[in-house]
Amino acid sequence: MSAWYSISGTVRVRRCPEVDAIAAQIRAHCDRDFAVNLVPMDAEVDEFSIEGTGEFGAGGVLALDELLESLGPYAVAAAVLTGEYENEPCELVVAPTTEAGATALSHHRLDQIKPMLRELTAQDRESLVTLLREHGG
């Protein structure tokens, strides 16, 4: 069984041999369907980027996600990669800590919501404020 998967985004990472090795594994895993780059930003930081769509055999998507997540300990800041898995939107958090990942995902969700807020009526905005207060927001 195979699955279509697309993913794109960037992660700023510390420059080190471990990151080079992970990037090489990701390139090998993705073959030619994905652009995988590691670009120097300054003396100590590189920007890892991935973009592409491909078909993966059983376990292939999970293996790619695990490789991408393994960049987390080397990440300078948490990042959210976005894509689609079998035509459904998906996100993958790459973060140095669980807390940093949760914060990055929260910011990502807020950025997704902001444009929709303009479409709410005044009454629905009040309902949203009430809902946020009820849930500790």
Task: Please report, for each region that a protein language model flagged, where it lies by residue.
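Charged interaction segments
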Residues: 25-137
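Short, extreme N-terminal segment that most often corresponds to the first beta-strand
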Residues: 1-29
